[in-house]
A protein has these predicted regions:
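ABC ATPase nucleotide-binding domain helical subdomain, centered on the C-loop/LSGGQ "ABC signature"
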Residues: 578-619, 664
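Hydrophobic alpha-helical segments in the permease module
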Residues: 224-236, 327-332, 404-415, 434-456
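Transmembrane helix-loop-helix hairpins at lipid-water interfaces of multipass membrane proteins
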Residues: 105, 111-112, 182-238, 242, ...
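Cytosolic ends of transmembrane helices, especially the final helix of ABC transmembrane type-1 domains
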Residues: 352, 375, 447-477
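An intracellular "coupling" helix at the cytosolic face of ABC transporter transmembrane type-1 domains
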Residues: 267-268, 280-292, 296, 300, ...
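Membrane-integrated ABC transporters
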Residues: 1-197, 215, 239, 243, ...
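Transmembrane helices of ABC transporter permease
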Residues: 223-231, 236, 297-348, 421-432
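Primarily ABC-family ATPase nucleotide-binding module
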Residues: 475-518, 668-673
Length: 701
């Protein structure tokens, strides 16, 4: 009876989860609610079952389909609350009964309070209430939450290249840290006020000494000054800690964004690009962190100290107010007039540095070519050309920086001299006390001392804009569309190629499970383009591809590639042999990995290694040889039990013994795969059911 009740209540439970998901992304108005509901319906159809067990799966798959990064985590109540306090948004289902699941959204974006949304109602609550709510379903044990970062959209969500200025990128990068940056500014303002303690104390001391010789006022001044300076040191310590937290978050956010973005890049748009070299720009995050820290700690403090000092000077005398105006105008002239072209030249210099890094990467990638006499000369000549280009760009940028530094140093000397002359005249005229003159000199010493550091901070600012511009190259990598079907309506696993133009001819074929097609070509790339189009990596310009009656574009990219496997070039990442085969797919057991490698007769070779399947491979595949690595790529594809297998010339380089084993494994009756192979070998094509020969003249069959 309970089971029947659960089934009857399933639509109600699904509706509760859907409403919670809509509340989960209520702060993202760019998400279409129609697309959201369509994705949710697809997820509930594919993962049919009890909402109490599957609500988190429905949520993550739905959000993934609309391009929202979400992560399901198992955590304690305390950890969930800490996530909310850090600004995350959580979807939890702490309590459920036979009528279904009752999800709740916990929104921690507000710094003052945490809000919860349940059954369409929103209210602010205290931490104690959140803790009680989360404990209501499972005591103090682990709870499952789906977590999203509400600030993820500030890293320039790219469905294509965007024209964004470097300064805008800095704002987008730092905007999620705005609350902490304001805290740093407040701390800097307090420190700026406390820097006045020394000149004011000196002013009081001069006046005290001038009118008497009592020791008690001096002691009181010393104690007060010590107190203020100690408090200032404590505030600077807190400021340093906050900036350190910002620096950590900056790295974590950019790294997380790229780990999400890179596996979703549109391969069709990356043709002709050296992606590994492009990814080197991530190293600019270290410079971004360092410069951000420097500007937040020193730059902001310098600006506020200068501003506060100028305000105090203005209160001393109207002439000193005019002195402030001249200083402000001069600083504006330094930054905006003398700095024209500084950002552009800094970016150009940075590009030249990456050109050098790209060339060195080429030298490391082609050891055979460059270990010859001619190769060494080519390496040196190209390096000299790149170095000359860098030096030219550096000179151009430094000329902008140098004129700013020279004017700042001149301003430092002129302002100190002018204040001394002006202040002395005001003291002689009786319009300024001697103590005020001394205090004014100390304040201006702080201000003009900042001018001496202006060059360093301007150089850091230019470096920040250049490094963020380089990170922007990664943020602008075009990503695949996240939407599409999670599961098709049919389960025939057929592949239909209709009026596909390949080799100068229009061809059509329908392949059912167990049927194979060979595309025999020598030097053409038509077969590769067709395979990439089936896999969703490329576009087909003529003809149609249907998988179970649907175009590859109708599927969500990741679900398409669960049904379709592609064996292309050898792709090995740093990890164990087992990791390189199973790719962390939870449905693939170690036994399945061993079974497929045994079928390909790789198991003995692997077990002869010291660590067996736990042997670490580097990016070159060492210690396995090329033939073993090619078979490993085949094992990676087959172990996932795809419905359609695409092989792009991966069999051509195998020796006859390995080829025989590979074909025997591929064509085993138990697999019932739709297999499409591009090859230049007629003996391979002869083993398959159908052959499209691109070696024949157009019009032949």
């Amino acid at each position: 009876m309970a089971v029947v009740e659960t089934v009857d209540n399933r639509p109600r439970a699904e509706g509760a989860v859907l409403r919670a998901v809509e509340q989960f992304v209520v702060h993202m108005p760019e998400i279409s609610r129609v697309e959201l509901r369509r994705a949710f319906h697809s997820a509930t159809n594919f993962w049919a079952g009890d909402a109490r067990e599957l609500w988190w799966r429905w949520t993550t798959e739905t959000l993934d389909s609309v391009g929202v990064r979400a992560q399901a985590v198992d955590c304690t109540v305390a950890e969930a609350i800490e996530l909310a306090r850090e600004g995350a948004i959580l979807l939890c289902a702490p309590d459920h009964d036979e009528s279904g699941v009752h999800p709740v959204v916990i929104d921690g974006r507000s710094q003052r309070s945490i809000s919860i949304r349940k059954e369409g109602q929103r209210r602010n609550v205290r931490l104690k209430q959140v803790r009680s709510l989360l404990k209501s379903g499972g005591g103090t044990g682990m709870i499952r939450c789906v977590v999203i970062d509400p600030d993820q959209k500030h890293l320039v969500k790219s469905m294509g290249p965007a024209k964004v200025k470097p300064l805008q990128r800095v704002w987008q990068l730092l905007r999620p840290e705005s609350s902490d940056i304001w805290l740093v500014v407040v701390f800097a303002f307090v420190v700026g006020l406390l820097t006045l303690a020394t000149p004011i104390a000196v002013e009081s001391l001069v006046n005290t000494v001038a009118f008497g010789r009592f020791l008690q006022p001096v002691i009181v001044l010393a104690i007060l000054l010590m107190s203020f300076l100690t408090f200032s040191a404590a505030v600077i310590g807190l400021q340093t800690y906050v900036v350190e937290i910002i620096e950590r978050r900056l790295f974590a956010r950019v790294a997380a964004d790229l780990s999400y973005r890179l596996p979703r890049t549109s391969q069709n748009k990356l043709k002709g690009h050296d992606v590994p070299e492009t990814v080197n720009r991530f190293l600019d995050i270290a410079l971004t962190q360092k410069v951000t820290t420097s500007l937040l700690l020193d730059g902001v403090g310098l600006l506020l100290s200068t501003f506060i000092g100028m305000v105090v000077l203005a209160f001393y005398h109207p002439f000193l107010l005019g002195f402030d105006v001249v200083l402000l105008a001069s600083i504006t002239f330094i930054v905006f007039v003398l700095g024209r072209g500084g950002v552009k030249s800094a970016i150009d210099e940075s590009k030249k540095k990456y050109a050098a890094a790209a060339w060195f990467e080429e030298l490391a990638r082609c050891p055979v070519a460059f270990h010859t006499s001619a190769g060494r000369e080519l390496a040196a000549d190209r390096a000299n050309t790149i170095i000359a280009a860098y030096l030219s760009a550096r000179r151009e940028h430094f000329s902008v920086l140098m004129r700013q530094i020279i004017f700042a140093l001149f301003l430092q000397a002129a302002s100190s001299t002018l204040l001394l002359g002006l202040g002395g005249w005001l003291v002689i005229s009786g319009e300024l006390t001697l103590g005020q003159l001394v205090a004014a000199e100390l304040i201006v010493a702080v201000i003009v001392g900042g001018f001496a550091k202006l060059g360093k901070h301007l150089a850091s600012f230019y470096d920040l804009l250049a490094s963020v511009d380089k990170l922007g190259v990664l943020f602008d990598l075009e990503t695949e569309k996240p939407s599409g079907l999670i599961s098709p309506p049919g389960h025939m696993h057929s592949l239909q190629l209709e009026d596909v133009v390949i080799g100068g001819r229009s061809r059509s074929i329908i392949l059912s499970p167990g049927e194979t097609l060979a595309i025999l070509e020598e030097n053409q790339m038509s077969g590769e383009q067709l395979l990439h189009a089936i896999y969703g990596f490329d576009d087909l310009h003529e003809g149609h591809i249907l998988i179970d009656g649907l175009s590859p574009d109708d599927f969500r990219p990741d679900t398409l590639r669960e049904r379709v496997a592609l064996v292309d070039d050898i792709e090995i990442f740093s990890g164990t042999i087992e990791e390189n085969v199973d790719l962390n797919r939870f449905q693939i057991s170690p036994a399945a990995v061993r079974e497929i490698t045994t079928e390909l007769e790789l198991a003995d070779d692997i077990l002869h290694l010291a660590d067996g399947y736990d042997t670490k491979l580097n990016s070159t595949g060492h210690p396995l040889n090329r033939n073993q690595l090619q078979l490993l790529m085949l094992a990676r594809a087959l172990v996932g039990r795809p419905h359609i297998l695409l092989i792009n010339r991966a069999l051509d380089s195998l020796p006859d013994d390995d080829l025989e084993r590979a074909l025997s494994c591929l064509l085993a009756p138990k697999r019932q795969l739709v297999t499409v192979v591009t090859t230049g070998r007629r003996d391979i094509a002869a083993c398959l059911n159908s052959v499209w020969s691109l070696q024949d003249t157009p019009g032949s069959h």
